[in-house]
Amino acid sequence: MSRIGKKPIELPANVTCERTGNAIKVAGPRGELTTIIPEKVEVVMDQTKVLVKRHSDSREDRSYHGLVRTLIQNMITGVSTGYEKSLEIVGVGFKAEAEGRNLKLTIGYSSPIIYAVPEGIDLKIEKATNIILSGIDKEKVGKVAAEIRRIKKPEPYKGKGIKYANEQVRRKVGKSVGA
């Protein structure tokens, strides 16, 4: 049996979870999220916890068992506390500015890069080199952070570029001058 899938999910007091057909809707103080549940698993709910069960022990059913449990857990955490990703910009003259729902990046290209931040993601700029993305959907927050990082990945020689706040950039030694 899936070790992750068989654990019950505790529902915080301010979060409600309801099932409509094959969709699960989780609502809390920060908003609400909905996801489609595959027919391979069954979700059993009561007032304080959610339990995910599977119909058979086939390989596919076992894989969905843990996946669905984790997706529901991420939805509950998102609507109760939310998710946050921090990015750092490293480089002389590199900076970020917020212009409404757009992020303007000045990162060494001939013109500034404008990135449109999707709905459901909150953008906060601390100093000019720290970007904080937050939202209730873990997948969406991570995807937006990865797209922003992809604009200028940190390079290994000087470490310039956009990196996650906790990311360690492996540095390489540059060319040595001939003797």
From Swiss-Prot:
GO biological process: cytoplasmic translation
Coiled coil: none
Pfam families attached to this UniProt entry: Ribosomal_L6 (PF00347)
Keyword Oxidoreductase tagged: no
Biological role: This protein binds to the 23S rRNA, and is important in its secondary structure. It is located near the subunit interface in the base of the L7/L12 stalk, and near the tRNA binding site of the peptidyltransferase center.
Assigned protein family: Belongs to the universal ribosomal protein uL6 family.
Name this protein carries in UniProt: Large ribosomal subunit protein uL6
Organism (species): Syntrophus aciditrophicus (strain SB)
